[in-house]
Amino acid sequence: MIREERLLKVILGPHISEKSTVLAEKNNTVVFRVAIDATKAEIKAAVAKLFEVEVDSVRTLVNKGKTKRTGGRVGRRIDWKKAYVTLAAGAEIDFVGGAE
């Protein structure tokens, strides 16, 4: 059993892009930015608890931070993790929350 306080720290927010919008419409898949150390089981449990939906599958990937130059120095952005969460048939997550 995963502790509730850990579940609240797993999901950092939705990842909104053209690709994620198309996936949401066609495949009932939602994309989230998640903690870099989060497991698929934790992500599945967190989405199920926070949004009260049934989750079919979770796919994850780690985006490597880009190298950027500032002045004469070379820096690097942080790595971050993205999760593609496929919801069960009929399940839906409304991020807007009643806006018309």
From Swiss-Prot:
GO molecular function: rRNA binding; structural constituent of ribosome
Keyword Ribosomal protein: yes
InterPro entries reported for this sequence: Nucleotide-bd_a/b_plait_sf, Ribosomal_uL23-like, Ribosomal_uL23/eL15/eS24_sf, Ribosomal_uL23_CS
Leader sequence residues: none
Subunit structure: Part of the 50S ribosomal subunit. Contacts protein L29, and trigger factor when it is bound to the ribosome.
Similarity comment text for this entry: Belongs to the universal ribosomal protein uL23 family.
Functional note: One of the early assembly proteins it binds 23S rRNA. One of the proteins that surrounds the polypeptide exit tunnel on the outside of the ribosome. Forms the main docking site for trigger factor binding to the ribosome.
Protein's UniProt name: Large ribosomal subunit protein uL23
